[in-house]
A protein has these predicted regions:
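Hydrophobic alpha-helical segments
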Residues: 1-189
């Protein structure tokens, strides 16, 4: 995959990026050892980059409610449903690391219904996939069912919001042709 271009569109050089975006990309590269392709691809549109990552961080970096591993679980399952290779691979790597379960991401991406999930994780995935597939079918009874299974309103909202946000992310990565970095494939294994 490494010979593939980062995007079907113009990709800016790091030196040409606004300083706040450049600093964020440099910080990510320092932590991970590489620059994820999505950062470079989205940096071509600075205002969208800022808005995208502000929403991403708001949903994915919360310390209350869903765990960070549960948040990544949603991303992997719904990205697989949306056929987004970038998000499956990138967030699969993060899921493996955060869950400390090296097989989980592959299981969920291939068939979430046969994955080795806890009851709580299965309820999260079932609800996320319903939002992904047919959000109009969500009823008051379905929300009450999630509540009866121990989910708070904030957790239910976050499952839906993460699913919706990554539908956007999946479509951006797919139409722009953003490939996953090779480094993601082996992380957390």
């Amino acid at each position: 995959m490494s010979d593939q271009p980062i995007s079907r569109f113009v990709v800016p050089n790091l030196a040409e990026m606004p300083s706040d975006i450049r600093e964020r990309i440099e910080a990510v590269a320092e932590r991970s050892g590489f620059v994820p392709n999505v950062f470079v691809a989205l940096a071509a549109r600075p205002e969208e980059f800022r808005a995208f990552f502000a929403m991403h961080d708001t949903l994915m970096d919360k310390s209350e409610g869903l765990s960070k591993a549960e948040r990544e679980l949603i991303v992997v399952a719904t990205s697989a449903r949306n056929d987004c290779l970038y998000c499956i691979v990138a967030h699969g790597a993060i899921l493996r690391i955060r869950s400390k379960r090296p097989l989980l991401a592959d299981q969920v991406a291939i068939n979430p219904f046969k994955a080795d999930l806890t009851d709580r994780e299965r309820h999260i995935i079932d609800f996320a996939l319903q939002v992904a597939d047919d959000s109009r079918s969500i009823t008051d009874d379905r929300i009450d069912e999630m509540r009866s299974r121990g989910f708070t309103d904030d957790e239910i909202w976050d499952i839906g919001a993460i699913t919706a946000f990554f539908a956007l992310s999946n479509r951006l990565a797919n139409f722009a042709g953003i490939p996953p970095n090779d480094e993601f494939f082996t992380m957390g294994r």
